[in-house]
């Protein structure tokens, strides 16, 4: 076969193989009562339309259109895999409590992150989830308060004080990274943290890339950064292990030491490599979600002067009970009730997570439909947040709707998941957010440089310009002890 004739043949083969696979899938599951819907064009399916909706911030409408057409359960094809879309409170309860649905990540994320809680199931998942919940439970978070307080103050002094304008999104991402690096890895200011910061940014950018390991591609750069991060973290973990064996540290000092202590007690059997992988997931999750929340809180306050004033009053009331430069405590954070209601309304109206992917590890039935083993589930968990059946006037920004959270129907407000799948880092994120806002609102007023700036989802909400703001320094009153 000549070169000239082989090229059309290869193109024809490339077109036919996906079509044949598509036909095989249809025949294989002909006896199943599959949900309504269409798998779309082979391989591509509805992937492009979903990505376009995320990028244009019309994902909610994209999902609503499918629900109106097919109902709250429908089949489609996303990222090359047959997929079932689930939405609504009943779906939230079903997905969060179903052990036969495990998290699915892209091939790029699996290669970059490794063997973590995102890819485990069964007994291993229970062990890791239990350990993470233990490390991030409120009693433990109280022990990290001083580190958080120090990191926030240092960050503001270095990056905000003396500046007339700042771009919020990248600064807040770095703040979230520094806090987690200090608390999780025990790494304060220094060259190790700086090296990790640069590599981590590269790795995060590669998580949604095409997983083709060719030099100079985004994925290749991310993979190399991931290897360097692992090398550094493995050494940190071994140093922590040595310090623990010599009695120089305790389980509350950092995540590595905590996990090593649990392993010595037989609570889990994770290797150092496994612990490193889960530490990377903790870093990525906290880095993204907390930074999104703080960024959009700052954006909200620029647009809502009345809310800004109420938050400032609450934070000044807390400051009155403290001495000069006295760090915040858990009790202080617990008193920031109005500030957290505003944060919850941000999470409702601009949810960091629109939806997530899971894989059925066995045949599952939901509402009379079959979800075959190996199929993906795209769980549009936050679509209930903007549903008028559960939230009156859902487009209106109104923190008072959280005055009595018991009035919100179960599984309708799920920014941190729910049931057995509740995010273990929700208290950590809450504390980090409130500490940051305490010091920001007491020291500054701000306004948006571009009032028309929108945001897109890549896949998390991100201001198009990074949220540049003009700063006005405010001298907070000084109080002694009340």
Report residues per predicted region.
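Cytochrome P450 catalytic-core helices
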Residues: 289-312, 427-443
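Cytochrome P450 proximal C-terminal region
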Residues: 2-5, 12-18, 35, 67, ...
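N-terminal membrane-proximal hinge/A-helix region immediately C-terminal to the signal-anchor transmembrane segment
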Residues: 2-114, 118-123, 127, 142, ...
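Conserved cytochrome P450 K-helix/beta-meander segment immediately N-terminal to the heme-binding cysteine loop
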Residues: 100, 379-406
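Conserved cytochrome P450 K-helix E-x-x-R motif and the immediately C-terminal K′/meander segment
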Residues: 50-71, 231, 235, 326-367, ...
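Conserved, non-catalytic sequence blocks in retroelement Pol enzymes and Pol-derived host proteins
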Residues: 33-35, 137-143, 245-248, 330-337, ...
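Cytochrome P450 heme-thiolate "Cys pocket" and heme-binding signature region
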Residues: 134, 285, 327-330, 367, ...
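Cytochrome P450 heme-thiolate monooxygenase catalytic core
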Residues: 103-113, 120, 143-294, 310, ...
């Amino acid at each position: 076969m000549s070169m000239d004739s082989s090229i059309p043949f290869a193109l024809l083969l490339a077109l036919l193989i996906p079509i044949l696979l598509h036909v095989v899938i249809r025949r294989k599951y002909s006896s199943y009562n599959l949900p309504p819907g269409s798998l779309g064009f082979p391989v591509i399916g509805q992937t492009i339309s979903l990505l376009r909706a995320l990028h244009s911030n019309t994902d909610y409408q994209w999902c609503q259109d499918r629900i109106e057409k097919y109902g709250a359960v429908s089949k489609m094809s996303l990222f090359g895999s047959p997929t079932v879309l689930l939405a609504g409170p009943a779906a939230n309860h079903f997905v969060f409590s179903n052990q036969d649905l495990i998290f699915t990540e892209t091939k790029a994320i699996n290669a970059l992150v490794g063997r973590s809680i995102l890819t485990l199931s069964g007994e291993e998942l229970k062990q890791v989830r239990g350990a993470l919940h233990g490390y991030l439970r409120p009693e433990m978070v109280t022990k990290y308060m001083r580190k958080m307080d120090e990191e926030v103050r240092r960050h503001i002094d270095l990056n905000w004080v003396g500046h007339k304008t700042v771009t919020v999104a990248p600064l807040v991402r770095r703040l979230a990274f520094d806090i987690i690096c200090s608390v999780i890895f025990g790494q304060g200011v220094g060259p190790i943290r700086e090296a990790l910061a640069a590599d981590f940014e590269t790795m995060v950018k590669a998580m949604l890339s095409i997983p083709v390991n060719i030099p100079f591609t985004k994925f290749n750069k991310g993979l190399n950064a991931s290897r360097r991060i692992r090398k550094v973290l493995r050494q940190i973990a071994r140093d922590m292990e040595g310090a623990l064996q010599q009695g120089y540290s305790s389980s509350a000092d950092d995540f590595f030491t905590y996990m090593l202590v649990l392993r010595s007690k037989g609570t889990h059997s994770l290797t150092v490599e496994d612990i490193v992988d889960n530490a990377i997931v903790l870093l990525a999750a906290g880095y993204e979600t907390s930074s999104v929340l703080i960024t959009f809180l700052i954006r909200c306050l620029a647009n809502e002067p009345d809310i800004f004033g109420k938050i400032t009053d609450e934070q000044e009331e807390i400051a009155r009970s403290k001495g000069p430069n006295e760090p915040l405590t858990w009790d202080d954070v617990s008193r920031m009730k109005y500030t957290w209601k505003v944060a919850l309304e941000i999470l409702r109206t601009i949810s960091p997570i629109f939806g997530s992917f899971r894989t059925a590890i066995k045949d599952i039935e939901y509402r009379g439909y079959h979800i075959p083993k190996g199929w993906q589930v795209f769980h549009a968990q936050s679509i209930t947040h903007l549903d008028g059946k559960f939230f009156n006037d859902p487009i209106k920004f109104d923190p008072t709707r959280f005055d009595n959270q018991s009035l919100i129907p179960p599984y309708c407000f799920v920014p941190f998941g729910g049931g057995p799948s509740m995010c273990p880092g929700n208290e950590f994120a809450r504390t980090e957010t409130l500490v940051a806002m305490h010091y920001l609102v007491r020291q500054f007023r701000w306004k948006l440089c571009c009032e028309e700036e929108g945001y897109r989802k890549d896949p998390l909400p991100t201001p198009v310009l990074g949220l540049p703001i003009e700063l006005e320094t405010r001298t907070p009153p000084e109080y002694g002890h009340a």
